[in-house]
Amino acid sequence: MLADVIYLFHMPLFVTISGAVYAIGKQSGKYQDFKSLLVNKVRRLLVPYYFVAYLFVVPTILGLAMNRFESNIDYFFLEILLGTNCRHLWYLWALFWMFIIVRFCKGRYLGNTIYCLIIAMILSVGCSYWVGTDWFSFRMALHYLPFFFLGEWLVIKDRNSMKMWKPVILVLLSGCILKLTDSKWMDSLFSLWMNVGIVVIVCLFIRKISVEKFFSHSFNILILRDSFGVYLFHVPIIYIMVSYLQNYPIYVLLPLVGVISIIGSLFFTMILRKMRLQCLMGE
């Protein structure tokens, strides 16, 4: 039950944060030139994607015989190279497309964030009817695009005018409609609205707590500083541990996997920095 609740909003929340970071960067003078944005996101997102995919994910998947293709070459080229089944790394390609789409739309056609948010919601709902292969995670980019614009909107929105009861009502209303309807497009629309409400509630809650106090703890500083490295490396470590320790009781396996995957990811991050290869992680 707890896992279901977390999975309901954790990716929308991450995308919203990415949109907020983009908005803050743009306010400080970044991303004014499309070419510089493109080069920056290739270096920050696609270089880590192919580095981690080929040196960590592919060997792990093939070594543990987890690939669904009969040929290892098919997995190596079709699924990883073209981003069709890239495990947790799909987020890098999706985020790359979101940066490009947002910069293109806001730079040339649509300056109003609300208009962009509405159009993104229409595209997101339309993605529920997407059939076929999701090349380079483009469908996932469209699916989560509203949350990127939401993050941008939350940055420019006057925080004093945002009341907690509004997103709470949105979540409750959306949940009720989801229970009462059996329409695919309505389910997609109100699932999206419910996620939007949950993300806004989380963001408003974070604003009310002492963020500075949270950031002052040394462990939190370490995790935040190396969070991208943890994201890149933790899944292959989890695959290996679960494969060899699957007979352990679940109450032992889960915390053990969680702790060791974080420590292992921090270790790989530190090694790459020591070797001056942090560029392979997008730094």
Language model features by range: what are they?
Residues 210-224, 237-283:
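C-terminal "closing" transmembrane helix and its immediate cytosolic amphipathic cap
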Residues 57, 117-128, 166-181, 199-205, ...:
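Hydrophobic core of alpha-helical transmembrane segments in multi-pass integral membrane proteins
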Residues 4, 8-13, 26-60, 69-87, ...:
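Transmembrane alpha-helical segments and their boundary/interface "anchor" motifs
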Residues 130, 159-221, 236, 251-252:
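Alpha-helical transmembrane segments and terminal signal-anchor/GPI-anchor hydrophobic tails
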Residues 99-121, 153-170:
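Solvent-exposed interhelical
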Residues 4, 8, 36, 44-45, ...:
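Residue-level signature of transmembrane alpha-helical entry/exit and packing/kink sites
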Residues 20-24, 98, 102-106, 144-160, ...:
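Hydrophobic transmembrane alpha-helices
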